Amino acid sequence: MSLNELIVAALKLFFYNKEQKSDCIFFCQVQIVIQISSSMFSLVIRRIHIRKLWYITVFTINASMFSGFFNNPSLLTPNENLLFQVGLHYSFAV
């Protein structure tokens, strides 16, 4: 699984619209800015909600939690979303 596919999996996990039973990523305009440093891997996501409200979502992954994770993506299993549930800290602001 590529890094892009992994990002999409995370987006689907956190933008899931429970009321409509659909994935909000298909209804939102998403802009992704990726910043990588020696210890942190950050995703800054700006999206437009269906109702045209702006949301800013910040995901931060502690790279030390994924020792060898990005160097060997073949180690991923179908449960890669669980890794994001454990490793992501997220906040929403209107």
UniProtKB/Swiss-Prot annotation:
Localization per Swiss-Prot or TrEMBL: Endoplasmic reticulum membrane
Record pathway: Protein modification; protein glycosylation
Lipid bilayer topology: Multi-pass membrane protein
GO cellular component: oligosaccharyltransferase complex
GO annotation terms (biological process): protein glycosylation
Superkingdom of origin organism: Eukaryota
Transmembrane residue ranges: 24-45, 53-70
Keyword terms, alphabetized: Endoplasmic reticulum, Membrane, Transmembrane, Transmembrane helix
Keyword Cytoplasm assigned: no
Function: Subunit of the oligosaccharyl transferase (OST) complex that catalyzes the initial transfer of a defined glycan (Glc(3)Man(9)GlcNAc(2) in eukaryotes) from the lipid carrier dolichol-pyrophosphate to an asparagine residue within an Asn-X-Ser/Thr consensus motif in nascent polypeptide chains, the first step in protein N-glycosylation. N-glycosylation occurs cotranslationally and the complex associates with the Sec61 complex at the channel-forming translocon complex that mediates protein translocation across the endoplasmic reticulum (ER). All subunits are required for a maximal enzyme activity.
Self-association state and partner proteins as the record states: Component of the oligosaccharyltransferase (OST) complex.
UniProt family annotation: Belongs to the OST5 family.
Identification of the protein by name: Dolichyl-diphosphooligosaccharide--protein glycosyltransferase subunit ost5
Organism: Schizosaccharomyces pombe (strain 972 / ATCC 24843) (Fission yeast)
Gene assigned in the entry: ost5
